[in-house]
Amino acid sequence: MMTTLTARPEAITFDPQQTALIVVDMQNAYATPGGYLDLAGFDVSTTRPVIANIQTAVTAARAAGMLIIWFQNGWDAQYVEAGGPGSPNFHKSNALKTMRKQPQLQGKLLAKGSWDYQLVDELVPQPGDIVLPKPRYSGFFNTPLDSILRSRGIRHLVFTGIATNVCVESTLRDGFFLEYFGVVLEDATHQAGPEFAQKAALFNIETFFGWVSDVETFCDALSPTSFARIA
């Protein structure tokens, strides 16, 4: 059954059962003091409301029959998956640069199996959800995301997570190029960097690549009364 979500720059109509809620990289690395972003000098002090808003969005999406996909960004403990000097990721990843500056952190930042790599305690995938590792900013690169979505007839993606201006925007942009309709819930995301990075990412998304809404509006669109109005 179709529902309409109020969004910027205009409302968008979708079928929740042909839509996925994407939770991007809600790991200790990105949302918890002592994690990679914090150690690299980024401010993570205001991530707690984002976690709570994601919990709310996930609950509403699950009740509406939406697929929930959780991404975890990172690599093997030897960082082979991160790429060597021949990869631009080796030179641009702040996690890798931080570990080169602080060798005692090797094997601790974004390494699979580490505390840093784990999802935050408040966000726990449930049976029926899909958890996908990803080795780069975009969730479409070297992952089965595209085939998972296409095999289920999913064309609409609702994004939450960290960081808005890095992995969230990268994945939404790649989805746009693959003909997916991308919506970001702005109060369920958080930037890496100054506040203007959040504003710039949201501007890019709503102007060029997708739609922007918020958690309360999203939950209202998934309520039974909203479906009744559409019907």
Swiss-Prot record:
Its EC number is 3.5.1.110. Keywords: Hydrolase. Induction: Up-regulated by the nitrogen regulatory protein C (NtrC also called GlnG) and repressed by RutR. One of its GO terms (biological process) is nitrogen utilization. InterPro entries: Isochorismatase-like_dom (IPR000868), Isochorismatase-like_hydrls (IPR050272), Isochorismatase-like_sf (IPR036380), RutB (IPR019916). One of its GO terms (molecular function) is hydrolase activity, acting on carbon-nitrogen (but not peptide) bonds, in linear amides. Pfam families: Isochorismatase. It catalyses: (Z)-3-ureidoacrylate + H2O + H(+) = (Z)-3-aminoacrylate + NH4(+) + CO2; (Z)-3-ureidoacrylate + H2O = (Z)-3-aminoacrylate + carbamate + H(+); (Z)-2-methylureidoacrylate + H2O + H(+) = (Z)-2-methylaminoacrylate + NH4(+) + CO2. It comes from the Bacteria. Hydrolyzes ureidoacrylate to form aminoacrylate and carbamate. The carbamate hydrolyzes spontaneously, thereby releasing one of the nitrogen atoms of the pyrimidine ring as ammonia and one of its carbon atoms as CO2. Belongs to the isochorismatase family. RutB subfamily. This is Ureidoacrylate amidohydrolase RutB.
